[in-house]
């Protein structure tokens, strides 16, 4: 049953009801069942950690995924949607370390790995319930029951298989490399992890001296921002090709050597130093210097504390002398290795432990955290006379993405996957992927791939998938395990879990006589696990082998732009290494969601609203649409603003809901008042003659076509603005322009066509918007589907809108010419509105004329066809169309496109710009025709110049106009005041106040009311306006309008005082209508004969009770009144022809159709009299004079629209009704005969009133 739609809606509350509906009918699982045998659409969901609550970044990516997978399902695919959880790695361990106060490996050793991992396992799914609640509340359909977790043994086994494939291909090796190292997490990070969290920091900036052994009065000067690396210094490096100088420091009296180009780093003035010698850097090669500290003097045997040369030393910063600590800098390591200062088998000079503290080798600073030791080191250098300058330096520095602590660079033995040798293949596979936006593939991701480095996959941690390598003590024998079965076979143990506590103790017998092989201690980088998820989530290749291979690569993935150096990268590396192909076909990359001030969202700073509170306040649909309709979907950043979500609710969802509500209201009215059942069947809907119907249907089909194209290309950022714009077009244009039609004011046939059009468009819009706003579309659909003719339904199951397939384009409905015509009309109306706003003239006040000037006669022809809408929307009396600019003083002027021309013309732009602005109207008219013009020797085209119209108000005869234009048209609006128009405007203000009170009372159009009014004092301007516009007001509000006093018997709904143009107006609405209705039985008539159509009324009795009309007389009266001649008439009610024996009184209030014989196509059945009327009450006739009756009805017009009755005619017709044509009468508005109807009261103001008829006495009466 069709439900009435409330005026006010609580979107979050309604969404909760929809969630209950989905749960009750298990809608998500049901849709998966329905699509089971359809083609597969493969989707991979990147696994988040459940150790924290979902934030806006998760919500955004989840919304994109939900939209695309819903779209894929509704496009005819089967889409498995499994949620995944990242359970291992630093995020989990860091939480445990904080909770338990664990500071390093020693603390874990004391606790034991078994207990440590049990602690980690206990918190892995800490917030899983909150995740499930939030994700579900957002409307995302995804399978939590069939999820995957990286801690499942099956998942871990597949990760082992992936690793073994790489190992067998020779892509895995062990090496020492200077890596980003997290001292808080006690583990190295990969290069891409270290790039995820840069911050601007202030570090020490020190200039240190290195006296030469050959002459200790001369010192090299090196610069560093990491003083803590100086105790590990083994060399300095200079550029062999750059110019170096020996100078005398005037103030200090010291002899120093540095790069000439870097003198400014130490000295502001040239007078501060004296250059003694110049020489290339190569001159310094091999010179020895005195070490800063004596901790590693033994390294001198290998050539340490020597000047080395390498071109990596640049002139952009420092002194051109770079201090080398090879185990704390990648370039330092390379250069020292090249000069044999260190070797692969050297004992590392790396006196810093996993927690970032100096070891006992550095005796002066042992146990100090390196960053804290900076001050102590600087103080020691100063005391030793080795410090030249100490300041601070602000620069961008990497922080640990998990612990948010500064990283250090440190050499550690690690396991690597060779990536550098597959860069070309990675780039080729990247080119096979479709990226949205494409720029990410070409720039950010492509550039990252070009510089890809070997991937450190090992972590010196505990809670993770163990790397399945069993090795001999000397690492010469290595066995890589690829499955549980293989390990069971080689170790002889039964295995149920693969975490460290379950496998670390297992040994494998050596095949080379090296005793037992033990597993290495490292676990996998958690990115290796997430990069393996396509295989591991289905336990490939141990299970689902064919299913996986048939569905690989994935059709679609989506994540944030930060994943270009994370999940996107690891997916591509592993798929390329394993199969030589990309892991996905299509990817959408979103930007970052920032706080409103542009800063990163921070729980500590509390600079963003809680997502759950936003959903509770505005609903999930509003949040989804806000995020998706923003730059963030184009991989740009979004500054999250709560008011943006509120505006989506206000500007999109609410107007859309109101259009839906308006449709339902009028369908219910149609059923209640006209007894017409509304059922929509797109196969039987007739083509509407109304141009706006054809336009909105065409516009919708164009939108569907656009939607298909852009969604297939994953361009959500183009689709959403068009959908939102369509909501605006539908609500602010179509519904607004057709309100009267939809209410039935233009006849029922036209009303039904308008309702069918609105229904069709709303249903199609709901189907298109279902992936984007799943809640509101479901809410609307559950009511709309009641009105769909079951015969027309093609989908097998129509319970939910999300079961329906997306609409397909109906080419036969597309009419580009009509779309263009309406677009022209909209431009005119919008230009007119701008003028009204500029002059502060409300739309309620009518204006005389609008002039539309356009160079294209075809455009004016289009505008002409829609003239009545311009009149209604702009409230003007007359539309004038013209191509004659000169008549109205219109000139063309030009403005250059600064961005386009400035970029192209560069220095010549200024002269060209000046000349463009000086082009004459005649020159620009020629440019309009040809599309090209030469200015200052440069050929310019349409895209280079913007043309605009200008209006000279002083030109003769146009002073009353105000103008506004766009690139195509100019409109002139006559804004001179006119009293009749001002009066009408005031009457519209009264209507506005009445309708607002109706809204306050939550009344619907079918609710009967009476409106009472009282102006401040009788005889005022406001009072006279209301009295003279009573009919106009009544026609609009569809309720009787009466002056005070309010009848004591009336039930008052609302009473309010308001100010109108300085006058006070009191309005009262009461329950029920006091309209008397026609006193006599009547039928409405539609006359369709002789090629014309007319409307009118026939009274079946008059006075009441005097029934003399049968079918034959009815046809005769029709022939007489409506001028239908020489035609054999047939009369129909609905589709049934009326016969002679039909009791006409039984048809009272119905609409009959009179034709030339054929049955009508559609009958309007209205219970409201089509023509204006008054009821008559005879007061004082003698009994013998009123044998015909004392109550009658008089039609003020018939046929419809012909109402020329005068006061004398009214007296004559009243006497005629009662058979009193020989008597003189007086007419009154009240029974007490105190308000006589005289000639100065317009007859049309009496519509629907009761007129009291008094018979004047004659001499015979005395």
From Swiss-Prot:
A motif ('KMSKS' region) lies at residues 600-604. The gene is IARS1. This is Isoleucine--tRNA ligase, cytoplasmic. It is linked to Growth retardation, impaired intellectual development, hypotonia, and hepatopathy: An autosomal recessive disorder characterized by severe growth retardation with prenatal onset, intellectual disability, muscular hypotonia, and hepatic dysfunction. The modification N-acetylmethionine is found at residue 1. It catalyses: tRNA(Ile) + L-isoleucine + ATP = L-isoleucyl-tRNA(Ile) + AMP + diphosphate. ATP binds at residue 603. InterPro entries: aa-tRNA-synth_I_CS (IPR001412), aa-tRNA-synth_Ia (IPR002300), Anticodon_Ile_ABEc (IPR033709), Ile-tRNA-ligase (IPR002301), Ile-tRNA-ligase_type2 (IPR023586), M/V/L/I-tRNA-synth_anticd-bd (IPR013155), Rossmann-like_a/b/a_fold (IPR014729), tRNAsynth_Ia_anticodon-bd (IPR009080). A motif ('HIGH' region) lies at residues 48-58. It comes from Homo sapiens (Human). Part of a multisubunit complex that groups tRNA ligases for Arg (RARS1), Asp (DARS1), Gln (QARS1), Ile (IARS1), Leu (LARS1), Lys (KARS1), Met (MARS1) the bifunctional ligase for Glu and Pro (EPRS1) and the auxiliary subunits AIMP1/p43, AIMP2/p38 and EEF1E1/p18. Its EC number is 6.1.1.5. NCBIfam families: ileS.
């Amino acid at each position: 049953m069709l439900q009435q739609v409330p005026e006010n809606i609580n979107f979050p509350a309604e969404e909760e009801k929809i969630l209950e509906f989905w749960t009750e009918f298990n809608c998500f699982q049901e849709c998966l069942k329905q699509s089971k045998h359809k083609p597969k659409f493969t989707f991979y969901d990147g696994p988040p950690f459940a150790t924290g609550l979902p934030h806006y970044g998760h919500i955004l990516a989840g919304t994109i995924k939900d939209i695309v997978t819903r779209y894929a399902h509704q496009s005819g695919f089967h889409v498995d949607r499994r949620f995944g959880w990242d359970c291992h790695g630093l995020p989990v361990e860091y939480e445990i370390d904080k909770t338990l106060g664990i500071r390093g490996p020693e603390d874990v050793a004391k606790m034991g790995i078994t207990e440590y991992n049990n602690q980690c396992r206990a918190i892995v799914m800490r917030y899983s319930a909150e995740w499930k609640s939030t994700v579900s509340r957002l409307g995302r359909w995804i399978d939590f029951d069939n999820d995957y977790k990286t801690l499942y043994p099956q998942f871990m086994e597949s990760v082992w298989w992936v690793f073994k494939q790489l190992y067998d291909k020779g892509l895995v090796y062990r090496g020492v490399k200077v890596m980003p190292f997290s001292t808080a997490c006690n583990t190295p990070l990969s290069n891409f992890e270290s790039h995820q969290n840069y911050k601007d920091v202030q570090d020490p900036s020190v200039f240190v001296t290195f006296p030469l052994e050959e002459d200790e009065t001369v010192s090299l000067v090196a610069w560093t921002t990491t003083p803590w690396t100086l105790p590990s210094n083994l060399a300095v490096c200079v550029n062999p090709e750059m110019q170096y100088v020996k100078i005398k420091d005037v103030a200090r009296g010291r002899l120093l050597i540095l790069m000439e180009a870097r003198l400014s780093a130490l000295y502001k003035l040239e007078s501060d130093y004296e250059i003694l010698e110049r020489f290339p850097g190569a001159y310094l090669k091999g010179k020895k210097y005195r070490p800063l500290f004596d901790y590693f003097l033994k390294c001198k045997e290998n050539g340490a504390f020597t000047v080395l040369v390498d071109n990596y030393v640049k002139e952009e910063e420092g002194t051109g002398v770079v201090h080398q600590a090879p185990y704390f800098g990648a370039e330092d390591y390379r250069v020292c290795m090249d000069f044999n200062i260190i070797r692969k088998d050297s004992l590392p000079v790396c006196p810093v432990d996993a927690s970032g503290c100096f070891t006992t080798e550095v005796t002066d600073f042992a146990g100090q955290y390196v960053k804290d030791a900076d001050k102590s080191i600087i103080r020691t250098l100063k005391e030793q006379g080795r410090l030249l300058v100490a300041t601070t330096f602000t620069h961008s520095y990497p922080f640990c993405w998990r612990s948010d602590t500064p990283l250090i660079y440190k050499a550690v033995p690690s396991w690597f996957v060779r990536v550098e040798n597959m860069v070309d293949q990675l780039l080729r596979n990247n080119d096979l992927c479709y990226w949205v936006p494409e720029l990410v593939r070409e720039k950010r991701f492509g550039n990252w791939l070009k510089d890809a480095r070997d991937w450190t996959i090992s972590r010196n941690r505990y809670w993770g998938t163990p790397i399945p390598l069993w090795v001999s003590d000397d690492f010469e024998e290595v066995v890589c395990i690829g499955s549980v079965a293989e390990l069971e076979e080689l170790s002889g143990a039964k295995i149920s879990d693969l975490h460290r506590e379950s496998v670390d103790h297992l040994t494998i017998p050596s095949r080379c006589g090296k005793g037992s092989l033990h597993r290495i201690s490292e676990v996998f980088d958690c990115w290796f696990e997430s990069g393996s998820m396509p295989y591991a989530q289905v336990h490939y290749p141990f299970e689902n082998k064919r299913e996986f291979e048939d569905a690989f690569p994935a059709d679609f993935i989506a994540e944030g732009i930060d994943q270009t150096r994370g999940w996107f990268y690891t997916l591509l590396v592993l798929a390329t290494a394993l199969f030589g192909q990309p892991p996905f076909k299509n990817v959408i990359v979103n930007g970052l969601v920032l706080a409103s001030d542009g800063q990163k969202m921070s729980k500590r700073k509390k600079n963003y609203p809680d997502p759950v509170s936003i959903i509770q306040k505005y609903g999930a649909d509003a949040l989804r649409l806000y995020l998706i309709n923003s730059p963030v979907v184009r991989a740009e950043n979004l500054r999250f603003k709560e008011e943006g979500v509120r505006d989506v609710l206000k500007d999109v969802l609410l107007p859309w809901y109101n259009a839906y509500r308006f449709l339902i209201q009028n369908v219910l009215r149609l059923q209640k008042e006209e007894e017409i059942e509304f059922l929509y069947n797109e196969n039987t809907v007739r083509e509407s003659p109304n141009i706006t119907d054809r336009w909105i249907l065409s516009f919708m089909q164009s939108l569907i076509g656009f939607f298909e194209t852009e969604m297939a290309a994953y361009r959500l950022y183009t689709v959403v603005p068009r959908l939102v714009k369509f909501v605006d077009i539908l609500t602010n244009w179509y519904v607004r322009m057709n309100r009267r039609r939809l209410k039935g004011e233009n006849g029922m046939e036209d009303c039904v066509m308008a309702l069918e059009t609105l229904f069709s468009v709303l249903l199609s819009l709901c189907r298109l918007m279902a992936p984007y706003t799943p809640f509101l579309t479901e809410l609307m659909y559950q009511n709309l589907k009641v009105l769909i003719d079951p015969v027309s339904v093609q989908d097998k199951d129509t319970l939910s809108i999300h079961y329906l397939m997306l609409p397909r384009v109906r080419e036969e409905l597309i009419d580009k010419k009509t779309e263009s015509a309406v677009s022209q009309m909209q431009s005119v109306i919008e230009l007119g509105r701008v003028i009204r706003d500029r002059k502060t003239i409300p739309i309620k006040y009518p204006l005389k004329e609008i002039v539309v000037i356009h160079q294209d006669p075809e455009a004016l022809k289009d505008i002409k066809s829609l003239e009545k809408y311009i009149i209604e929307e702009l409230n003007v009396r007359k539309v004038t169309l013209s191509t004659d600019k000169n008549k109205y003083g219109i000139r063309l002027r030009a403005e250059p496109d600064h961005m386009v021309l400035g970029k192209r013309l560069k220095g010549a732009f200024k002269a060209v710009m000046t000349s463009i602005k000086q082009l004459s109207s005649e020159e620009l008219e020629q440019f309009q025709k040809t599309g090209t013009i030469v200015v200052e020797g440069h050929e310019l085209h349409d895209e280079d110049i913007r043309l605009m119209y200008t209006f000279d108000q002083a030109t003769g005869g146009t002073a009353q106009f105000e103008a506004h234009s766009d690139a195509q048209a100019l409109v002139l609006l006559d804004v001179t005041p006119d009293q009749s128009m001002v009066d009408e405007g005031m009457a519209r203000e009264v209507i506005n106040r009445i309708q607002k009170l109706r809204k306050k009372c939550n009344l619907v159009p079918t609710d009967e009311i009476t409106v009472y009014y009282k102006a401040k004092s009788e005889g005022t301007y406001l009072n006279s306006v209301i009295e003279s516009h009573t009919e106009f007001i009544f026609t609009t509000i569809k309720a009787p309008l009466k002056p005070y006093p309010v009848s004591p018997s009336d039930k008052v709904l609302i009473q309010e005082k308001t100010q109108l143009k300085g006058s006070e107006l009191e309005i009262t609405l009461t329950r029920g209508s006091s309209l008397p209705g026609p006193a006599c039985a009547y039928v409405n008539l539609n006359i369709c004969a002789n090629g014309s159509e007319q409307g009118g009324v026939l009274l079946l009795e008059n006075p009441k009770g005097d029934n003399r009309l049968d079918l034959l007389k009815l046809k005769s009266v029709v022939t007489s009144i409506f001028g239908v001649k020489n035609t054999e008439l047939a009369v129909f009610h609905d589709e049934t022809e009326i016969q002679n024996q039909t009791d006409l009184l039984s048809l009272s209030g119905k609409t009959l159709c009179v034709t030339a014989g054929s049955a009508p196509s559609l009958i309007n059945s209205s219970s409201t009299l089509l023509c204006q009327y008054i009821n008559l009450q005879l007061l004082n006739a003698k009994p013998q004079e009123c044998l015909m009756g004392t109550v009658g009805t008089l039609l003020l017009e018939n046929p419809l629209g012909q109402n020329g009755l005068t006061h004398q005619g009214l007296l004559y017709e009243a006497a005629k009704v009662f058979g009193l044509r020989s008597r003189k009468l007086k007419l009154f508005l009240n029974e007490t005969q105190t308000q006589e109807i005289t000639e100065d009261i317009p007859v049309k103001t009496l519509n629907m009133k009761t007129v009291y008829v008094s018979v004047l006495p004659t001499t015979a009466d005395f």
